[in-house]
Amino acid sequence: MKTRLLTLILILLLALPHTALAGEPQIELTRSQKGVRTSTDVLLVAMPVATLGIAIGKKDWKGIGIGVAEAAGTMAVTYGLKYAIHKRRPDGSDNHSFPSGHSSLVFTDASFVMRRYGWKFGVPAYALAGYVAWGRVYGKKHDTWDVLAGAAIGSAIGLLCTKPFMKNAQIAPAALTDPQTGQFISIGIGGTVNF
């Protein structure tokens, strides 16, 4: 099971750089714009790899499967819309601007991390996702609507499909009795979660 899951992850990670291989820009970019574009391509791969590292460190095998499924679902929705809408990119390189694939994937990752592992991992992930979205606009690959749509798609999938990881959760049945009479009152479930 773990071998198949890791193979699927490797295939998805190898496919990610392909999303950055759109046609050549039809406008002149500054050195800064080219550098920011490259950094967004790097983060497109680095963020899921870091998330994978967190999950492996926590031995969260189920979470890895959920994350891979969310990434695949995000790619399907995003590319379905890209090929249905045919919006021209600001740099003129192709007609697949809406929605931003980079934004949708990194916001799926950030939402997954925030929901699954908490704010200590989630806040930096959202900051990086915000940088990627900004960088796609600055690098003339998208306009603001493209990255907002990508962020909305990614965040929705990540937040709706992820459950918090509670490795240290303990749940136990509890019977309550009246201290005066010793008679049974109700049954409940109690528990603790250690983070």
Residue ranges of each PLM-predicted region?
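Interfacial segments of alpha-helical transmembrane regions
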Residues: 54-73
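Hydrophobic core of alpha-helical transmembrane segments in multi-pass integral membrane proteins
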Residues: 47-53
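Hydrophobic alpha-helical membrane-embedded or membrane-associated segments
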Residues: 49, 70-74, 150, 154
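Residues at structural and domain junctions
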Residues: 50, 66-67, 110
